[in-house]
Amino acid sequence: VILLLITSTPSVDARLKAKDNMPLASFHDNAKRTLQTRLINTRCCPGKPCCRIG
């Protein structure tokens, strides 16, 4: 009987999630992609006066 209960329970997603229930890995990928796009668009590096990001 116990084995039937264990197999019938819904699976648990063990990945870390952000506040809006979005997986953190996806959140970090989106942030990285956005930063790379902005660096390409501005053609500068963070820490330099020309850069609009940092």
Swiss-Prot record:
Expressed by the venom duct. GO terms for cellular component: extracellular region. Pfam families: Chi-conotoxin. Contains 2 disulfide bonds that can be either 'C1-C3, C2-C4' or 'C1-C4, C2-C3', since these disulfide connectivities have been observed for conotoxins with cysteine framework V (for examples, see AC P0DQQ7 and AC P81755). The modification 4-hydroxyproline is found at P49. One of its GO terms (molecular function) is toxin activity. Residues 1-14 form the signal peptide. Keywords: Amidation, Disulfide bond, Hydroxylation, Ion channel impairing toxin, Neurotoxin, Secreted, Signal, Toxin. It is found in: Secreted. Residues 15-42 form a propeptide. It comes from the Eukaryota. The modification Isoleucine amide is found at I53. Coiled coil: none annotated. InterPro entries: T-conotoxin. The cysteine framework is V (CC-CC). Negative results: does not have the ability to interact with the G-protein coupled somatostatin type 3 receptor (SSTR3). Belongs to the conotoxin T superfamily. This is Conotoxin vc5a. It comes from Conus victoriae.
